[in-house]
Amino acid sequence: MKPLIKHRTATFLALMFVCLPSFGQAVMTNAPPTAKDPQPPAVAEPDKAWSFSVSAYTYIVPDSREYVQPTLTADRGWLHLEARYNYEALETGSVWLGYNFAGGKKLAWEFTPMLGGVFGDTTGIAPGYKGTLSWWKLELSSEGEYVFDTRDSSGSFFYNWSELTLAPVEWFRFGLVTQRTRAYQTDREIQRGLLAGFSFKHVNFTTYLFNPDESRPTVVLAVGLEF
């Protein structure tokens, strides 16, 4: 019996000799990193890219000259920059600085308070705003400003443009529009009308019909590009 025991003991020791290094290597491989182990570098979040929009509104006003009102906007994160021409008055420009706010999911909203400088035929300082409220296929949008005319206080005025639209499909919308302006002469303090527009990729086209109850309503043709 003793030779058999010695043989088994020798076999067991040989197996231990072979397996222990492999077991130790596996333990070292699976061991958690120590405090001295190098950590992967943190990846900085990239800055939000700029987004731009360009639009041109062509006004066809009865018994008045036709004119084009262009607007350029640039946004990056919270920052909003904007430039307009022929908005507050003809041959008048304005530049704007704003702060973007946004929130909501089902009922989404955006709001941008702004401060602008007006120069040209009308000169002054103008606090303003832009905002949208969206739910389902409905959207309410509004932009306004109050121009403090620094040349003539009687020229101070509140401007507003508001839309309520329904988009049954992604590329088409229609609805109601109102505006309050002094860019051209009108007998109505607030003009009301209808709108219909469609979009293709980054381009959108909209037709506005103000004062449709009049024999000669005001027509505005708008085209916009976003990139």
Residue ranges of predicted features:
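Intrinsically disordered, low-complexity segments enriched in small/polar residues
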Residues: S22-G24, T29, M114, V118, ...
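Feature captures outer-membrane beta-barrel proteins of Gram-negative bacteria and organelles
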Residues: E66-G77, T92-E110, I125-L140, S156-P168, ...
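Onset of an N-terminal alpha helix
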Residues: D47-S51, R65
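Cleavable N-terminal export/targeting peptides
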Residues: M1-K48, F227
